[in-house]
Structure formats: C-alpha cells, structure tokens
C-alpha cells in the first residue's frame, strides 16, 4: 500500500493560484509559510523559519537566527514583491 504524501505548502500555493508568487529557496522554509497577503506576497512566520532551519541543519537556535538574519532577512529589501516575514508581538 502506498502512502499518500501531504502536499507541501508551495504546492498548496500553486493550487490556490499563487504559483507566480516569490518564495524562498535554499532553504525553502516551506513549513514556515502561513499565508498570502492581499497583494499575493507569501507570508512566512519567523519563529517557524528558525525552527525549520534548526531541524533541517541540526544547529542551535543562535546559529539558525544568525543564518536567517544574514542570508534571508537582509536580502528582502532587494526583492520587489518578495516574501513577507511575520514576527509575532511578544505577549506581556
């Protein structure tokens, strides 16, 4: 019996008509995709990006944050209509 794979979030974006939206690649942070903005930009959850990177690369929280800040967040201003990274407000 073959087991049916759960579709990736990228696949779900394509099925919903957002195949032209810009997504991260290498790493993809697929499990951190949480939605799409009204103008069609893919929204990622920052905390889930960190968790995804830590899991995929077997690294510490600090190493994951450093990689994401330097290699991903820093590049966002140079990508027109690029992804949005959501940082949740801290609870008081």
Describe the residue ranges of each PLM region.
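C-terminal alpha-helical interaction appendages
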Residues: 3-92
């Amino acid at each position: 019996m073959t087991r049916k794979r759960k579709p990736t979030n990228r696949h779900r974006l394509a099925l919903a008509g957002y195949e032209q939206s810009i997504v991260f690649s290498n790493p993809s942070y697929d499990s951190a995709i949480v939605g799409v903005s009204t103008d069609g930009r893919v929204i990622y959850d920052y905390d889930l990006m960190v968790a995804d990177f830590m899991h995929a690369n077997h690294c510490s929280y600090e190493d994951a944050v450093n990689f994401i800040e330097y290699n991903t967040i820093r590049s966002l201003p140079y990508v027109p209509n690029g992804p949005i990274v959501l940082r949740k407000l801290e609870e008081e």
